[in-house]
A protein has these predicted regions:
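Structured alpha-helical subdomains that flank or immediately precede key functional sites
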Residues: 1-97, 115-125, 129-135
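Predominantly the structural core of cysteine protease catalytic domains
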Residues: 2-12, 83-87, 110-230, 235-271
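Acidic helix-start/capping segments at beta-turn-to-alpha-helix junctions
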Residues: 97-112
Length: 271
């Protein structure tokens, strides 16, 4: 993977943030099957039909602020994006016990013993091999294997669901409309923290430095389709720790980072 130094800055609340999602190398081929190769892509009309369904789940009405982690001053966004996707896919797949899993446990498997970021592909592969442990046991500061190996037996009972590599924007929109959890990369800077009156983050210029989980795809009251994103910085940021993203946020990142879709097990897959 294309290892890069994490982007470090002070957020609007004076906390140190490190964004460390690595870009994929040129001609990268994911080890996961592609979403586009496994599922038919929906047309924009079919996607809109799904988003307008009055019975459609609205994640913000189901999952409260306790589902919003704070990765702290570490470059562990890939681990938290993977753990958030697993926690939510598990919940919406029928295991309604409210268990929330640790991104730092996943990150510890892939950071090579230093807090210098990681690649999403590696996080998902290791999550599938080694599993997940509760965030309440393995907190954000536990980012090294010397701290997390004591959880390995327990984590092995919660191995991740299958992931699909998303290659295109139409694939991303189709997966979101079908209820998949999404793992994406965005560029984070000062604009990212500024939400407009609709709750949509500003767009920063760059190829992507922060990985997040989007747990919903929905229409705003003005008809704009948006991806609902877990910011991973606690509930003080955004609206209770979440923000909306549009296609514009991914225009510079979808070719430079590999995106993923995680099935929930109950979404179904038909227009």
């Amino acid at each position: 993977m294309s290892e890069e130094e994490p982007f470090e800055f002070i957020d609007q609340f004076g906390e140190v943030r490190r964004c460390g999602s690595w870009k994929v190398p040129e001609n990268f081929v994911s080890s996961f099957n592609t979403f586009e190769g496994e599922f038919p892509l929906w047309t924009d009309a079919q996607i809109l039909q799904a988003l307008k369904d009055p019975g459609r789940r609205v994640t913000r009405k189901v999952l409260g602020p306790e589902w919003i982690p704070n990765q702290g001053p570490y470059s562990s966004c890939n681990g938290f994006a993977a753990a958030n996707a697993y926690s939510r896919a598990r919940y919406f797949g029928g295991k309604r016990d409210g268990k929330i899993f640790s991104g730092s446990y996943v990150y510890a498997w892939v950071n090579g013993g230093r807090d210098a970021g990681s690649a999403l592909e590696d996080s998902l592969k290791e999550q599938g091999i080694h599993g997940n442990v509760l965030l309440s046991k393995c907190g954000p500061s536990m980012i090294y294997r010397s701290q997390t190996q004591k959880f390995d037996t327990e984590a092995a009972q919660e191995k991740a669901v299958n992931a699909y590599a998303v290659q295109t924007m139409q694939g991303l929109k189709t997966a979101g409309a079908a209820g998949f959890m999404l793992i994406v990369a965005i560029q984070v800077g000062r604009t990212w923290e500024r939400l407009d009156s609709r709750g949509v983050s500003g767009v920063d210029s760059g190829g992507g430095n922060h990985a997040v989980c989007c747990d919903d795809y929905l229409l705003l009251p003005d008809g704009t389709p948006v991806f609902d994103c877990v910011m991973d910085w606690g509930t003080s940021h955004g609206v209770n720790g979440k923000t909306y993203l549009t296609e514009a946020h991914f225009a510079q990142t979808i070719g430079r980072h590999q995106f993923y879709a995680i099935p929930t097990g109950q979404a179904g897959y038909s227009p």
